[in-house]
Amino acid sequence: MIPKKIIIMAGGSGGHVFPGLTIARYLIEKGWLVNWIGTKNSIESRIIPTYGIKIHYISIKGLRNTSLKNLIISPIYILRAYYAVKKIIKTWSPDIVLGMGGYVSGPGGVASWNCNIPLLLHEQNKIAGITNKWLSRISTKNMQASPGVLRNAEVVGNPVCQSIIKVPNPINRFKNRTGLLRVLVIGGSQGSSILNRILPKVSFLLKEKIIFWHQTGNYELEKTKKKYNKLRLNQNLITSFIKNIASAYEWADLIICRSGALTVSEISIVGLGAIFIPYPHKDKQQHRNAEDLELIGAAKIIDQSNLNTKLIVNILNSLDRDKLFIMAKKAHSLGVRDAIFNIFNVINKISKKT
């Protein structure tokens, strides 16, 4: 039997890459051949090859920067990327092309449509990104994590890796847990400067109550470590990136983080109370992602413009492990744990028509 082939397009941020990687690994288990479209010097260039997945690099940039120079150069990058992906498609002849959103998906989505290859989209957020909005008009099938985001789309959830789904539930995690409150700090896959600046001060003021596991991102690891060391805060674990995120979720009583779609989905699946500081996009995409958890009392949302040391200290002082356990159980009630199966069923169904 000839194996089916798929090209997955995802890059720029962990929020696009990691869901795509989860899908890729599951498809490989099912006998599919997978190629990837991404960009160099990016999170996908560091991670995807380590899983034995062939990655093709294109030169493309996002359109959030609307400077005159960017507006002039962007069409050139898009056109070059379009022809590069079109060549890959014609050479490899995939059965399906899957776009995970973000600027990497744009040229390849149009190229797959032009080559009459079924184009599938997956939207992780509660507000669709500009690329998925455009491509949804020409795609074969749209998938979304939440209802009402893309037109004519099937709700499938956000795919997360099995290690996260297997994290013990809040009842088992919190049982017999004592000692300092364990707070996980994650500013997205590339870190957050504002969290790296504020959290060492918070740690100093609450060193008798809190221990942090802080992911700083690659660029600010040493600078953030110096802040903690200067305050003689040796009990905290400071790392640039947490590869085994499931172990970090299992360890934590609470998470302070951005509210990217994948992070919110993972927190719901694991069951973990959260303090969200949404990235301040104009469309408030991350704020929308976090609203359901705040509504049921599983999380608190702080706009970045209001964020300061005193506010975080006051919130943490108001919490104890019993309250965090209640927040964790509420978060757990919203977890969607069958997303990968839903997505595979859609992909498999479309592939049988090719």
UniProtKB/Swiss-Prot annotation:
Which UniProt keywords are listed?
Cell cycle, Cell division, Cell inner membrane, Cell membrane, Cell shape, Cell wall biogenesis/degradation, Glycosyltransferase, Membrane, Peptidoglycan synthesis, Transferase
Q: State the Gene Ontology terms under molecular function.
A: UDP-N-acetyl-D-glucosamine:N-acetylmuramoyl-L-alanyl-D-glutamyl-meso-2,6-diaminopimelyl-D-alanyl-D-alanine-diphosphoundecaprenol 4-beta-N-acetylglucosaminlytransferase activity; undecaprenyldiphospho-muramoylpentapeptide beta-N-acetylglucosaminyltransferase activity
Q: What is this protein called?
A: UDP-N-acetylglucosamine--N-acetylmuramyl-(pentapeptide) pyrophosphoryl-undecaprenol N-acetylglucosamine transferase
Pathway info: Cell wall biogenesis; peptidoglycan biosynthesis
Biological processes annotated in GO: carbohydrate metabolic process; cell division; cell wall organization; lipid glycosylation; peptidoglycan biosynthetic process; regulation of cell shape
Q: What coarse category fits the chief subcellular location reported for this protein? A: membrane
Role of this protein:
Cell wall formation. Catalyzes the transfer of a GlcNAc subunit on undecaprenyl-pyrophosphoryl-MurNAc-pentapeptide (lipid intermediate I) to form undecaprenyl-pyrophosphoryl-MurNAc-(pentapeptide)GlcNAc (lipid intermediate II).
Q: Which residues bind UDP-N-acetyl-alpha-D-glucosamine?
A: S13, G14, G15, N125, S189, I242, A261, L262, T263, V264, S265, E266, Q286
InterPro entries from the UniProt entry: GlcNAc_MurG (IPR006009), Glyco_trans_28_C (IPR007235), GlycoTrans_28_N (IPR004276)
Pfam families hit by this protein: Glyco_tran_28_C (PF04101), Glyco_transf_28 (PF03033)
Q: How does it sit in the membrane?
A: Peripheral membrane protein
Q: Which GO terms describe its cellular component?
A: plasma membrane
For this protein, the Enzyme Commission number is 2.4.1.227
Spell out the Gene3D superfamilies in the cross-references. Glycogen Phosphorylase B (3.40.50.2000)
Task: Report which reactions are catalysed by this protein.
Answer: di-trans,octa-cis-undecaprenyl diphospho-N-acetyl-alpha-D-muramoyl-L-alanyl-D-glutamyl-meso-2,6-diaminopimeloyl-D-alanyl-D-alanine + UDP-N-acetyl-alpha-D-glucosamine = di-trans,octa-cis-undecaprenyl diphospho-[N-acetyl-alpha-D-glucosaminyl-(1->4)]-N-acetyl-alpha-D-muramoyl-L-alanyl-D-glutamyl-meso-2,6-diaminopimeloyl-D-alanyl-D-alanine + UDP + H(+)
Task: Please tell me the species this chain comes from.
Answer: Buchnera aphidicola subsp. Acyrthosiphon pisum (strain 5A)
